[in-house]
């Protein structure tokens, strides 16, 4: 495909957050009741945590947010300026400006809604032994309005795109926006993809998630989220392969594409279910001493996967690209990457 064919081919919508990342100790995790390998929304008890992190530990500030990470990684893998675009809500403040600069430098075409009254959202990333836990204080990210999406200059991004990716986290913010995008995708034979994102989404936002399920052509998630999904739906199995098959067989709103379920399992093989069959793909092994942190690993996997999907590549290539991207990211702090990919 000519590079002009890739113009705005992939659109992401989600919660743009500034990652406040630090290697912490067990005492800190216990104090704030934080479990590793989890993602939650901040409660009042977590609010002093962000300041305490910056006082006690060596903190890094990295532009993040699950969907934004994936879109940036896809953009990096594609190496075609303007191939991706992204919408979400930030505050009118220095963090928001930093986010804009970072995403634009990454080559992503961003159309943020800017909320006058609320600060840009942050996400505490607590790292211990290479594992991460996410505590998101959405702030401005929670203020995205469907009216912003409906503006002609923003809806034009929806019309231009052929692939859509929305993390499950956005279900807590603007289900109306997701509805407009998924219905457009189904009506125009475009590819709509989502992520389970976190156990709490599967558990406490089950109803809004269920409304999206028929529209999902690809469902991404990790083993913990898949097992929570299974429990919440009364499937009575913890077997990730069985869960992946069941998810791929849930009813579809449009018959254009069969649904594919893609479940990552950390260092264990990636499980892919389609057509009632399961395939497993090994990840790239990494010696423990090379692991910096797993923050952004799942996001990077999706970004790599989507970069090949928009090229029309088969599942095997998409998974290989996903594994490559996440392997790069876990050797660095946060969801960051070198200037150019080395994927061929």
UniProtKB/Swiss-Prot annotation:
Pathway: Purine metabolism; AMP biosynthesis via salvage pathway; AMP from adenosine: step 1/1. SUPFAM superfamilies: Ribokinase-like. The keyword Magnesium applies. Keywords: ATP-binding, Host-virus interaction, Kinase, Magnesium, Nucleotide-binding, Purine salvage, Transferase. GO terms for molecular function: adenosine kinase activity; ATP binding; copper ion binding. Its EC number is 2.7.1.20. It is an enzyme of class 2 (transferase). PANTHER family: ADENOSINE KINASE (PTHR45769:SF3). Belongs to the carbohydrate kinase PfkB family. This is Adenosine kinase 1.
